[in-house]
């Protein structure tokens, strides 16, 4: 993750919150604790703090229009896509944050595939931040988070629920959650999968890396 001088206040604010929660005296004490921690807790906490989690449903909508108008028809007519009589489709949301992107993928696929039962669809959602991965698995979003979605789609793909504070919220329907597998993953470690993906969404994580790192990741995605 590339952290320039323009991110200093962001980093200071996020670590300041952790220091207060741990009732530490300041950054020096926190740094000393990081150096002596052998459990891995410090590293996970640091990664969760500095990974930015800006996301929303149907963010960068052009990508989902491309899925509907180009990707789905291309996969459908590919003979190699059929396995066991079904059309195989695999997608990956790399840097999935709290899951809005991958659930938007699911909704887009269901809205634009006429006979979904004839498809074998599996979506992978990964992120370095363990907290947002857990959020995505739960699939619960505040009314504010879903406010940009068409009411007809909310009714079709969400159930009324409550958030962790007991406030009215929405939860993705079970059939959407079953399409997605959430996993904690560091993009710079070994990837625990070998099968090819038909599409990868990675913009939301790539923008936080410098150019050489971006080029290295693009080559890995391609391979």
Where are these regions (language model features)?
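Active-site catalytic pocket residues across diverse enzymes, especially alpha/beta-hydrolases
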Residues: 71, 75, 109-113, 140
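A structural alpha-helix within SAM-dependent methyltransferase catalytic domains
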Residues: 68, 106-110, 222
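Conserved AdoMet
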Residues: 1-92
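Active-site micro-motifs of SAM-dependent methyltransferase domains
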Residues: 17, 36, 73, 111, ...
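A short glycine-rich, Lys/Arg-flanked "PGG" loop and its adjoining helix->strand segment in the class I
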Residues: 215-223
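Conserved class I S-adenosyl-L-methionine
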Residues: 84-104, 118-124
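Extended basic-aromatic, gly/pro-enriched interface segments that bind polyanionic ligands
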Residues: 94, 114-201, 205-213
């Amino acid at each position: 993750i590339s952290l320039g001088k323009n991110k200093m206040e962001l980093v200071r604010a996020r670590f300041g919150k952790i220091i207060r929660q741990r009732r530490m005296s300041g950054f020096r004490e926190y740094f000393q604790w990081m150096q002596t921690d052998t459990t891995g807790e410090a590293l996970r906490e640091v990664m969760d703090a500095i990974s930015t989690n800006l996301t929303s449903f149907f963010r960068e909508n052009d990508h989902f229009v491309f899925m509907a108008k180009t990707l789905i028809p291309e996969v459908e007519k590919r003979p190699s896509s059929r396995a066991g009589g079904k059309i195989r489709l695999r997608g990956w949301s790399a840097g999935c944050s709290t899951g809005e992107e991958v659930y938007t993928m699911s909704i887009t696929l269901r809205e634009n595939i006429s006979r979904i039962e004839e498809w074998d669809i599996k979506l992978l959602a990964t992120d370095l931040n363990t907290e947002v991965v857990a959020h995505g698995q739960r699939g619960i979003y505040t009314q504010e988070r879903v406010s940009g979605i068409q009411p007809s789609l909310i009714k079709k793909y969400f159930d009324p629920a409550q958030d962790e504070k007991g406030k009215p919220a929405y939860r993705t329907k079970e059939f959407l959650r079953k399409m997605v597998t959430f996993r904690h993953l560091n993009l710079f470690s070994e990837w625990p999968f070998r099968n090819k993906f038909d599409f990868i969404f990675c913009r939301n994580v790539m923008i936080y890396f410098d150019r050489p790192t971006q080029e290295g990741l693009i080559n890995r995605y391609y391979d």
